Amino acid sequence: MSPQTETKASVGFKAGVKDYKLTYYTPDYETKDTDILAAFRVTPQPGVPPEEAGAAVAAESSTGTWTTVWTDGLTSLDRYKGRCYGIEPVPGEESQFIAYVAYPLDLFEEGSVTNMFTSIVGKVFGFKALRALRLEDLRIPIAYVKTFQGPRHGIQVERDKLNKYGRPLLGCTIKPKLGLSAKNYGRAVYECLRGGLDFTKDDENVNSQPFMRWRDRFLFCTEALFKAQTETGEIKGHYLNATAGTCEEMMKRAVFARELGVPIIMHDYLTGGFTANTTLAHYCRDNGLLLHIHRAMHAVIDRQKNHGMHFRVLAKALRMSGGDHIHSGTVVGKLEGEREITLGFVDLLRDDFIEKDRSRGIYFTQDWVSLPGVLPVASGGIHVWHMPALTEIFGDDSVLQFGGGTLGHPWGNAPGAVANRVALEACVQARNEGRDLAREGNEIIREAAKWSPELAAACEVWKAIKFEFNPVDTLDX
């Protein structure tokens, strides 16, 4: 063997398998301001100590592998390794604990949500020593936040662009989501916008199917939008879904939307992927488009309490990747969402600085510095009777989106839009007068219905509709 390639055990390398905790469990470590911090809910296999399981998570999501390797000696593991620096029991769960892991910032490519997730959650979730693993929260350091452009301009700039202030924005998802021709689809858009809504929306799976190709939909919806805008004197928008099978096709649709002069487009950011989403967000910023984000597929990732990734992490990632709106659940509608948890990640979307608050599921203080905020979108199984609660829960900086709650009105789409607009204006006025929306909500709606026949008809149709199921994802006791 050539002297240049000969290796000897005497240089300090010792082959074999080492316990992860010997290298990656460091309870005395003091976290740095530049570290990315993660909170994992860990369910180890029977017989695996918490310290070993937590260290395994830190190792397998950073520099570690299952055995000692020669090339460990060619770099500084102390500089680059992830560290499990804390273990915390989960109340009422003997087999679970929270493991806190710190990652050096140099492990991650600047401005890449894709790379961040590939490292932190890319492989370790299939590790055999763990029965289940869930990423509960991330602390993104300021140094890393500043490598992202985030949402196009933020909430205030969107309000200025739309000239709408002092209330939540109103939207509607066109139904049925699949099967309409482009012309009939555009007709429904026009009726809803004419009736008083600010936005209408493509559903998440409306892309370019045989019954309605994307270009036809874009043209008819744009015609509807400008016609309603002319008649009402209000700026209107329709979320034209640019999601496609390739990034090139997605960008072609975005370019066409810009050429049509519409104010906003849409993307399914989880099924489309973070690389595609960030690419589209950069284009929207450069070309004056707002970007609405749908979270289709999120529940596959975030709904189970023991395994996956909490939506608050996906929400933070979206704010970094870029998007002006994102669906966030409703608390009161048909979709999963416990109140305090939902309010926690809504604040993470909108506010500049959010304190650690375990009562709302927030594990770390997060400083977004100058990264613009995102409007949360409440959508899914909501109707006029929910308006007081939605206004009280989400406040003005939100989009309240009624699909069936608009198009299901017995008199048609435009009266359905009128009913929602009247209900919203009544709730905002009552709140501004000092009334308690949580306690007096039904009374406020009944009073408004006396002078709005459209609202009265909507109240009658949906008076008995409730979705009374307990959420799966709840706060720990």
Curated annotation (Swiss-Prot):
HAMAP family: RuBisCO_L_type1
Role noted for this protein: RuBisCO catalyzes two reactions: the carboxylation of D-ribulose 1,5-bisphosphate, the primary event in carbon dioxide fixation, as well as the oxidative fragmentation of the pentose substrate in the photorespiration process. Both reactions occur simultaneously and in competition at the same active site.
Organism, as annotated: Gerbera jamesonii (Transvaal daisy)
GO BP, sorted A to Z: photorespiration; reductive pentose-phosphate cycle
Domain of life: Eukaryota
Similarity field: Belongs to the RuBisCO large chain family. Type I subfamily.
InterPro entries assigned: RuBisCO, RuBisCo_large_chain_AS, RuBisCO_lsu_C, RuBisCO_lsu_C_sf, RuBisCO_lsu_fd_N, RuBisCO_lsu_N_sf, RuBisCO_lsuI
Keyword Lyase among UniProt keywords: yes
Residue ranges annotated as propeptide in the record: 1-2
Record PTM N6,N6,N6-trimethyllysine, positions in chain: 14
PTM info: The disulfide bond which can form in the large chain dimeric partners within the hexadecamer appears to be associated with oxidative stress and protein turnover.
Sites bearing N6-carboxylysine, chain numbering: 201
NCBIfam families the record matches: PRK04208.1
Note: The basic functional RuBisCO is composed of a large chain homodimer in a 'head-to-tail' conformation. In form I RuBisCO this homodimer is arranged in a barrel-like tetramer with the small subunits forming a tetrameric 'cap' on each end of the 'barrel'.
Residues that hold Mg(2+) according to the record: 201, 203-204
Quaternary structure (record): Heterohexadecamer of 8 large chains and 8 small chains; disulfide-linked. The disulfide link is formed within the large subunit homodimers.
Name this protein carries in UniProt: Ribulose bisphosphate carboxylase large chain
Residue numbers annotated as active site: 175 (proton acceptor), 294 (proton acceptor)
Transition state stabilizer (site feature) positions: 334
Reactions that this protein is recorded to catalyse: 2 (2R)-3-phosphoglycerate + 2 H(+) = D-ribulose 1,5-bisphosphate + CO2 + H2O; D-ribulose 1,5-bisphosphate + O2 = 2-phosphoglycolate + (2R)-3-phosphoglycerate + 2 H(+)
Location of the protein in the cell: Plastid, Chloroplast
Residues carrying N-acetylproline: 3
